[in-house]
Amino acid sequence: MDELQKLEYLSLVSKICTELDNHLGINDKDLAEFIIDLENKNRTYDTFRKALLDNGAEFPDSLVQNLQRIINLMRPSRPGGASQEKTVGDKKEDKKSQLLKMFPGLALPNDTYSKKEESDDDEKVKAKPEKHSETHKKTDMSDVDAAMMELEALAPGEGATLVRPHKEVSSRDRHKRRSRDRDTKRRSRSREDRHSDRRRSRSRDKERRRRSRSRDNRRRSRSREDRDRDRDRRHKSSSSRDHHERRRRSRSRSTERRDRRDRSRDCSEKMPPPSAAMTDDPEAGKIYSGKIANIVPFGCFVQLFGLRKRWEGLVHISQLRAEGRVTDVTEVVTRNQTVKVKVMSITGQKVSLSMKEVDQDSGKDLNPLSHAPEDDESLRDRNPDGPFSSSTSMLNLQGNGMEGDEHESRKRVTRISSPERWEIKQMISSGVLDRSEMPDFDEETGLLPKDEDDEADIEIEIVEEEPPFLSGHGRALHDLSPVRIVKNPDGSLAQAAMMQSALSKERREQKMLQREQEIEAMPTSLNKNWIDPLPEDESRSLAANMRGMAAAPPEVPEWKKHVIGGKKSSFGKKTDLTLVEQRQSLPIYKLRDDLIKAVTDNQILIVIGETGSGKTTQITQYLGECGFTARGKIGCTQPRRVAAMSVAKRVAEEYGCRLGQEVGYTIRFEDCTSPETIIKYMTDGMLLRECLMEAELKSYSVIMLDEAHERTIHTDVLFGLLKTAVQKRPELKLIVTSATLDAVKFSQYFFKAPIFTIPGRTFPVEVLYTKEPETDYLDASLITVMQIHLREPPGDILLFLTGQEEIDTACEILYERMKSLGPDVPELIILPVYSALPSEMQTRIFDPAPAGSRKVVIATNIAETSLTIDGIFYVVDPGFVKQKVYNSKTGMDSLVVTPISQAAAKQRAGRAGRTGPGKTYRLYTERAYRDEMLPTPVPEIQRTNLATTVLQLKTMGINDLLHFDFMDAPPVESLVMALEQLHSLSALDDEGLLTRLGRRMAEFPLEPNLSKMLIMSVALQCSDEILTIVSMLSVQNVFYRPKDKQALADQKKAKFNQAEGDHLTLLAVYNSWKNNKFSNAWCYENFVQIRTLKRSQDVRKQLLGIMDRHKLDVVSAGKNSVRIQKAICSGFFRNAAKKDPQEGYRTLVDSQVVYIHPSSALFNRQPEWVIYHELVQTTKEYMREVTTIDPKWLVEFAPSFFRFSDPTKLSKFKKNQRLEPLYNKYEEPNAWRISRVRRRRN
């Protein structure tokens, strides 16, 4: 064995040790080598597992599969084998075939039908005619299928079986109905649900067997009664003189039997037909008829009918009626009254009954989910801790358990006495108590939040079994890190990024400390000064001033006033040229005819041109002028919303039409187009959604993928879809534009398409590097800007930073430093650029600087390619960018500061050479550029969460993800994680195929968990509130905190706080704005962003339109907040966290320590269980938008992901906890230890 093989073998041993440690807590090198030796001798799974069992290793099946997979994957290659050198194509095929064996769930056969053939609301299901006979037969029944699908959607759940009162259903009718149901279900079977139908057919077989057994039992019972009657007749006809007493006893017994039969026959006319044979004992969860035998102050005793033995049970006074509180039992029932009861529990001879869970008229079970009887096989097929399966959850939730929600929402408050209520009212009116501190206090009933300490300690753990289609490769796969986005994690650039994160954290902590000091200095109760008849001097005027501050619009910081120029600011023209002259001055104008000829001659064209050459605005107009719009629209995609809107506005001006007529745009939650639109700009995500409806995009004649070099996740998916579309539609033209020089890769991917180059206006650029690495790149960049301003010739400066927080900090520091230099220094105009800026501030970056002054534009990487700013001669490049990276630990995307690529560095340097010869100051060494930067940026599809992308591909019928034609394929681990996440959301079934719920989730332009939450709210009857919450979550920064009024803004925000959490706080804000007639003055008074609320209103309208199109009911939950919390839990159950005894909370998925954000409504309450919307890394890992939950809901809505822990074993959560001993707070924490005590004595 050579050195390389030894290293490979050691790596394999280390990996096996890690797996054993993760699963069993054993880290033994000898054991790992023994397992590898066993696998080498037993290559098949069965023999390998048997060998492990023979040696006493009772490992779980998932661990055995994982061990064998790792050994086969990492086994050292043997020299001298038959393997020869292979070509690159053969290696790729071998790799794909190897992945196909490892991950069969990623290579399911694609569906051949088109998405357009299905209507949005599932009313018409028309199969595409094909040559296959099976599909041809299905087309004849399409109308019947559509009708039966509607009936299935309207059908009640399994537990809600309707019963005809006072009438027995004949067995013939039952047989006919069952036959019709079976025929209906057989006809409505769809292609993708074929496997799940097999399971349903098995369950129907079990149901038929159970019913047949029930009929046999009834027949045996009737035959037994007939024999009893014959025996009675024989006893009656006997005339023996010696047995008069026995005959008399026999007659009395037969009379009693007849009486019992008559009574049971009378009772059976009132009861629903029995589903099983008569039993001796009652069964929990079943409904029985009975008679009130006795009434006591705390309830009533009911004698049960339909049992061989005499049984009586107690109906407690709380179980008599669901509506309102019962104080007197006789108000509800009377003695000898016939009622219907449900058996809740049986303890020995004591039976607990309930009347409120049974409809007294029809005998219907109002809460079938509790004590739902199931046969053994169905229990074995699903998670035993889940109260219902995911396939029937939507139907079972509809109309069931709502009374329990109302009861649960009622029991979370407690009533207080009248004197206490009076005291609290007086303290609130006097200003001693703030009304916002007691949001649940009711002045009439005196309700206060009830402490939840008395609840039972429930332990929840994650279900370790993977979905069947990911067996051995799901949750057991721990190395789920995406493609590495940093070339050298130990290099100077990575160290500088970490240092900057620490410095920004320190700045945030200082701001938080300053805010706390301002809050402490704020007067606590301003109302006192108004109520007090003899206030102190000037105290009432202080209160008036503080109140008046809220009504005024927010003040702008000093540096921002300087940026926008206050009231004196003027936004003049950048040029005196007309629109026609401006178009003719662009570099692309000279190549107009050549470009049109190239588009006409080629179906696919790659266009390369510098930023500002006119690609985005002119190519679409040229094609429209040449008649390409006669065959369809011209579509142009943009990676950003702001770019799509601004470009469409500019093109509409040049085209000479109103925006939304011939030229329009479509972005998420906003459609500014009309039937006359022929040139349409849109985000790449919107075009991808159009592909969901029509894969071939027949309404378009030309598709232009602009800014393709940015390689967003939507652009990469569109590459594969449009590559297929142009093969099916020869008349469709595809143009791919890029501002960088990676055109060869695009050309090779798109069938070696020709490249059309637009020469730019470039000048030489001098590149300067630092001699030593910079630790604080923010401070170094500001010093560089000041040096350029004070020493270099005239010319504007462009500084690249990573995000809004950094840019605002840089603007503030730079403004203060320039101010400290005095008035003799030439003016430096500071202009920030990021998407959250108001439009008037964004416009100023294009204005030329006044004579004698210089402007510095501080921007994110949007200025690399998307923006063209004239007059830039100097570029300062710290070498960093903020990228979205998928964190496999948290299962979420997070923004991380990383070094840029070499291609991005070249692009930034090119910004200095557009107007004249320029300079680029790179704040890193030349060695770092060469050794620590990747050649090109990592595509977004290789570093982000793919759940939404996989759901969209599945909706388009693309199940074979392994062979989908990606330009750069995403990591297999990311695809597996996305499939596992979709399966836990019930969007995929156990075989990896799309469910009906998943298909409906894909119709909403939301993340999968938000879509699931919105759809489940319909079943939970709270869709009106969830619609508002989702729209508020889709926007950001609802509240604002002016620097000089932070304490007052916090007070205003506190009055909206809800005891349930932040989601309901957002709902309260929107509803309050709505009740105030959407007033702008109300927003200013309460420190709420008016633009954010209006945006949320637009989002809500679009989502409401989608729900109306799908005929989803919009129902309000009223005051029942439990339903809203359940709906939130159904979508975000992965983001559950439990309070940790030591500090903060621990997430259930990865036991990460997190904290409630100080701005949360629950910050001071600290509930036991919470659900969060997202994690934010500032000074700590903070949870944003937090809501309290009941841990039982996690198992209820995610039975495939969570289950109750075994009470006889120590849960994983408690294993990770650390016992902290009590100690004297005045001494050091370890002073209680024996060693410390001895040392102190000595």
Curated annotation (Swiss-Prot):
Residues 388-399 have a biased composition (Polar residues). Residues 596-759 form the Helicase ATP-binding domain. Residues 75-283, 354-449 are annotated as: Disordered. It catalyses: ATP + H2O = ADP + phosphate + H(+). Residues 87-97, 113-141, 180-196, 253-269 have a biased composition (Basic and acidic residues). Disruption phenotype: Lethal. RNAi-mediated knockdown in the germ line results in defective nurse cell morphology. SUPFAM superfamilies: Nucleic acid-binding proteins (SSF50249), P-loop containing nucleoside triphosphate hydrolases (SSF52540). Pfam families: HA2_C (PF21010), HA2_N (PF04408), Helicase_C (PF00271), OB_NTP_bind (PF07717), S1 (PF00575). It is an enzyme of class 3 (hydrolase). Its EC number is 3.6.4.13. A motif (DEAH box) lies at residues 706-709. Belongs to the DEAD box helicase family. DEAH subfamily. DDX8/PRP22 sub-subfamily. Involved in pre-mRNA splicing as component of the spliceosome. Facilitates nuclear export of spliced mRNA by releasing the RNA from the spliceosome. Before and after egg-chamber formation, required for nurse-cell chromatin dispersal (NCCD) probably by playing a role in spliceosome localization to chromatin/interchromatin spaces. Identified in the spliceosome C complex. This is ATP-dependent RNA helicase DHX8. It comes from Drosophila melanogaster (Fruit fly). The gene is pea.
